[in-house]
């Protein structure tokens, strides 16, 4: 959620338009004060050129998830970023000017904005236009690319499925070329016999081969279950800890179970995923670990989600402080899905930290409302006990003389954009 992505997403976008924006770029500081060049309603203090809409969407959705009513100017800023055709670019410094052909619109930011605005309510016109645009750029395989005209990828397809579900659409009914989004999604799933069996690939390589990608897997598991960035955890034992089960081409439910099994195994030893970057020392992958918690909890593997959740509670504070609103949002989503208290996440209050990165909310649960919210979380945690696109490393990507920092979510890129 997180939103968010991998270098593969950037490479795919470069193929189509020369260069592309990551779903999320790390904020150097979570300080709330905006510089003269940043809109007052925007969350985060980092350059929003590549992730403004993504981080704003995740921040607002995370606030809504924990009962916080965001500042009106923050919501208005997000809605005001929409282009006339319904799409969203990562950031428009002058939204009064119409989007032109040079606007770097993308499916990930658009889908994330839909999820946030649909949850907040009162923006049917905006979300309706955005969904219409998303349908117009759907590929014939049923999936979506990061930028229109590119090949479908698991992360983009997943975040759009979440957007469709958020507005009450049935993703399986959104068909292009006789294919639904789920047809595309299961096409990225590796067979159990393969290395990394059960996982999802970001997209096929040039020879059609699939390589396991934890970022894509976490996103795809949630999407295959018909959920979005702020997925709900499922109580009960679930099937997140079982092995991969082949039955020919899996249906979405089986693909989700297989993907969750892969993720559960990936975090079983250390409690976290690892970011493997060319030329860099392997480091914990905080963002994709947060997304993994969401995926395991949504699939029903609450027991498997507890180890990575506890690891995040113990180790993710510095990462979130540096990552800013999108990172805090990913942790809120993880806590929400796994039944933890986001106001006591390893001793820190994620909600207060998130709120501090932008304009003061209109309302925050206090007193009995806050206690009720906490009791609900504890109940979910007890029920399930029986059973964030950011990589720590940064990439320097050159395209048309432009370099920018990537953070991986899943993934995804791929906030892509949680």
Model-inferred region functions:
Residues 2-418:
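Preference for long, amphipathic alpha-helical scaffolds in soluble/luminal domains
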